[in-house]
């Protein structure tokens, strides 16, 4: 069985209660560029990396996951006392039950919008009420959905979800819809696309409903929102996420497991100042400036996480 969008395969394993199986060697190869390389794993290849683990060591990992890095780093990751899930609520978002009926795009140029209706601009409202827009027959609010081309802040609102009171009442009762984690709708948080890319692009959410294709991160200490936004855009977190989760998705559970390091006061102030600068920039025209400030943040996080790098 394979999944075309992510080039994954399913391997069936046989369970064995014999203690001797714990001495099995498990080899994991990464870095494949072509399908043909699958048949050449015994040959020397510049692309391929091989990690070898005892089955007994894998059983010691949290949730028995494969952590693809050297053993010293595995110990540090497994022994992390504080994780993202300890300092933030990490949740998935809303599902209408029928996106083609209830979700609209700003224009046909939006990625993935070909089969969606275009929103009527006269029916867009600034409503942040969980019970819906009152006294209108049909109304829409801005909706965070899918990936972002930019870090820190999205270029524009590309998607809208129907949010008049009658429709919200329908979502709550409908068996197909998922009005899940609704206490976080319209709150200030961080959006990370569920589908993994080479580089995480985390963006700030304010006064928005967010889709189930988004993992929302909501720091428990409100003064850490900018710090967490910068952290999730860092090379360190991008690397760690790929280490602990080599699959195609950034699920909420994997993000919760990421090691968290508490910043000192000066470090927090510096990161906050840098993020304020970025948020004041134009995400379309100031790309190089944003990347330069983000690189300053990267250097700070590299020091904070230097024992794992």
Regions found by a protein language model. Name each.
Residues 1-127, 210-214, 222-225, 247-255:
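Signature of N6-adenine DNA methyltransferases within the class I
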Residues 1-2, 245-249, 262, 288-291:
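Alpha-helix capping and helix-loop boundary segments enriched in small/acidic/polar residues
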Residues 12-14, 145, 191-194, 216-218, ...:
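Short, well-ordered beta-strand micro-motif
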Residues 13-19, 234-238, 260, 277-280, ...:
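Short, well-ordered loop/turn and helix-capping segments at boundaries between secondary-structure elements
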Residues 67-207:
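Segments forming glycine/polar-rich beta-alpha architectures that bind adenosine-containing cofactors
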Residues 71-95, 119-120, 262-309:
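Non-catalytic DNA-recognition/assembly elements of restriction-modification systems
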Residues 183, 195-257, 264-268, 272, ...:
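Basic, amphipathic alpha-helical recognition segments used for DNA target recognition
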């Amino acid at each position: 069985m394979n999944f075309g969008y992510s080039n994954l395969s399913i391997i069936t394993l046989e369970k064995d209660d014999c203690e001797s199986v714990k001495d099995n060697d498990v080899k994991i190869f990464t870095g494949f560029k072509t399908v043909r390389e699958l048949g050449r794993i015994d040959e020397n290849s510049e692309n391929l990396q091989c990690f070898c683990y005892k089955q007994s060591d894998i059983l010691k990992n949290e949730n028995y996951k494969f952590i693809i890095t050297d053993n010293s780093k595995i110990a540090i990751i497994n022994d992390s006392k504080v994780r993202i899930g300890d300092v933030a609520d990490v949740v998935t978002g809303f599902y209408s039950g029928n996106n083609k009926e209830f979700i609209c795009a700003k224009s046909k140029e939006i990625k993935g919008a070909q089969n969606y209706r275009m929103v009527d601009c006269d029916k867009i409202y600034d409503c942040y009420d969980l019970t819906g827009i009152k006294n209108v027959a049909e109304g829409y609010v801005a909706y965070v959905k899918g990936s972002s081309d930019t870090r820190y802040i999205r270029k524009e609102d590309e998607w809208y979800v129907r949010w008049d009171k009658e429709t919200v009442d329908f979502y709550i009762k409908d068996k197909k819809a998922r009005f899940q984690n609704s206490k976080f709708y319209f709150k200030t948080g961080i959006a990370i696309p569920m589908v993994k890319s080479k580089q995480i692009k985390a963006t700030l959410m304010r006064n928005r409903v967010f889709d189930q294709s988004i993992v929302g991160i909501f720091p428990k200490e409100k003064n850490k929102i900018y710090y967490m936004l910068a952290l999730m855009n860092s090379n360190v977190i991008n690397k760690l996420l790929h280490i602990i989760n080599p699959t195609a998705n950034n699920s909420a559970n994997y993000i919760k497991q990421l090691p968290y390091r508490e910043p000192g006061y000066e470090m927090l102030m510096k990161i906050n100042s840098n993020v304020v600068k970025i948020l004041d920039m134009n995400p379309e025209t100031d790309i190089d400036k944003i990347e330069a400030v983000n690189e300053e943040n990267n250097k700070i996080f590299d020091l904070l996480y230097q024992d794992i790098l």
